[in-house]
Amino acid sequence: MEQFSARLQRLRERKKPLRNRKVTSELCGLPPDAIRRYERGEAIPTADSLIKIADYYKVSIDYLLGRTNGI
């Protein structure tokens, strides 16, 4: 999940306007501390959470998980 954490952080930091982890979590429909915990590797996202994050950033789940380099 190390690759997931790094990609998630990179996506969040590049998205305009820049949003903090709590706001990003809320916009994805996740608990307020979810993005922080995922970026730090403290938690593993559920399939439902992966779908919400992928939809928010308009990327594939395969990209988030490091299975492909194409967004």
Question: Predicted segments — roles?
Answer:
Residues 1-17:
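A short, Lys/Arg-rich alpha-helix, primarily the initiator
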Residues 2, 14, 65-71:
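Short, charged recognition helix plus adjacent turn
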Residues 9, 21-22, 51:
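Residues within the helices of the helix-turn-helix
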Residues 12, 25, 54:
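The alpha-helix within a helix-turn-helix
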Residues 17-37:
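Short alpha-helical DNA-recognition segment
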Residues 40:
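Short, conserved catalytic or interaction motifs in soluble domains
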Residues 48-63:
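DNA major-groove recognition helix of helix-turn-helix/homeodomain DNA-binding modules
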